[in-house]
């Protein structure tokens, strides 16, 4: 989505409003918004959005399912018992989606959204 395109979803779908149990604000200023993302074993987030591009740093991976428009788009493979290191990836803005943790361990990430 480009800057010229309007964000089509309401602010109420923002992760902090729509999925507060799994998204906690760590810091926000005029340049970034940093979220602590935790999805407990067996939990499913409510549907939500992320309007800004971001860097996602996963330090506690788990087996998850990623859904968009009610359809399963991705299922993470089983992880080794010990997953060394932090996984870092670029994320474009995300429309309505939710994540289900199907693992026996929690999922944890820090998401740095760029303004």
Located regions from the model:
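Hydrophobic alpha-helical transmembrane segments of multi-pass integral membrane proteins
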Residues: 3, 39-40, 46-47, 99-104
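Glycine- and acidic-residue-biased ligand/ion/polar-headgroup-sensing regions
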Residues: 51-71
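A short glycine-rich, His/Asp/Glu-containing loop-to-beta-strand
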Residues: 19-46, 51-57, 109-112
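Ligand-binding loop in jelly-roll beta-barrel domains
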Residues: 92-115
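N-terminal low-complexity, Pro/Thr/Ser-rich intrinsically disordered segments
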Residues: 1-19
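Short acidic-glycine-tyrosine-enriched beta hairpin
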Residues: 71-93
């Amino acid at each position: 989505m480009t800057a010229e395109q309007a964000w089509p979803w309401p602010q109420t779908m923002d992760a902090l409003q729509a999925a507060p149990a799994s998204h906690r604000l760590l810091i926000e200023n005029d340049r970034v918004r940093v979220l602590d993302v935790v999805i407990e074993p067996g939990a499913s987030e409510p549907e939500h959005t992320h309007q800004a591009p971001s860097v996602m740093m996963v330090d506690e991976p788990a087996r998850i399912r990623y859904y968009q428009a009610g359809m399963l788009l991705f299922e993470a493979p089983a992880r080794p018992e010990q997953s060394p290191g932090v996984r870092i990836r670029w994320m474009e803005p995300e429309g309505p989606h939710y994540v289900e943790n199907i693992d026996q361990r929690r999922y944890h990430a820090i998401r740095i959204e760029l303004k």
